[in-house]
Amino acid sequence: MCKVLNVSRSSYYSWLRRSPSKHSLENRELFYLIKRIYELSKRTYGSPRVTIELHKRGFHVSRQRVARLMKSQNLKSIIRKKWVITTYSRHNYPVVENKLNRDFNTTRPEQVWVSDITYIKTLQGWLYLTVIIDLFDRKVIGWSFSRSLKAAHTSIPAWKMAVRNRMITRKLIFHSDRGIQYACHEFANLLSSYNLVERSMSRKGDCWDNAVAESFFKTLKVEHIYHHSYKTIKEAELSVFEYIETWYNVNRIHTAIKTSIKDKKEKFINQLVA
């Protein structure tokens, strides 16, 4: 080996005994934290979210360095899959114009809520999940499980949960697609009883008008649902409930707001009382 490297035997053994460099030690400590954050995210975080979490913990490191360390140990975010649009809008109920117009930026809670419905497969049949999300902090503030697609079992109970969780005290835009659950008289009349609520609907066949809600379902399925095979409806309900209430709504980093939902709300409250 010494002949190949063209160095003396003493120099070679001196190199072997040499202590790791400061940079190597930093990388070792950094990688330990990166791996810990990656595992806590259930292998869903890529370098952007891992970097945000490191910054929160006081480690000011570039995303490029995090990406290199993750790549060196083959730490990859779960591959994302395409999602299926499941809106049924072939009905005769009146629809409203798109007042949101893809403006997903808000300055306070209870300014814009978005909603959508998705399907979850189980061996007992389909389970339908309806969610309502506050655009300010991306929190799922209302949701409902059902075996039926009627508004009484989807949009209406999700709305009732949302208004229990967050009081409407100022003008609120409620945005959804044109699905029958949002256009029907039962749901329209319910929202009209709230004077501060203004309805908004996506343009026909345009999923990007409701991109935040669509993105949530994509995240839910890629990070969680696709890794489970649900035998029963109850099993699926419990699994999705735990994902929303113990991970997504609490600790998950959201790149759109560059923090977790909990931290975003706390920062807003601190600004109000400052």
What do these predicted ranges mean?
Residues 1-2, 12, 34, 50, ...:
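Mobile genetic element proteins and their domesticated derivatives, centered on retroelements
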Residues 2, 9-108, 261-270:
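Basic, flexible linker segments flanking DNA-binding modules
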Residues 4-11, 29, 95, 154, ...:
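Generic alpha-helical secondary structure signal
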Residues 20, 192, 219-274:
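C-terminal domain-tail junction helix/linker
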Residues 21-24, 58-60, 88, 104-106, ...:
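Conserved, non-catalytic sequence blocks in retroelement Pol enzymes and Pol-derived host proteins
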Residues 89, 176-178, 184-185, 199-221, ...:
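RNase H-like two-metal-ion nuclease catalytic core shared by retroviral integrases
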Residues 102, 106-141, 148-149:
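An active-site-proximal beta-strand-loop segment
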Residues 144-167, 183:
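Active-site beta-loop-alpha junctions of metal-dependent nucleic acid enzymes
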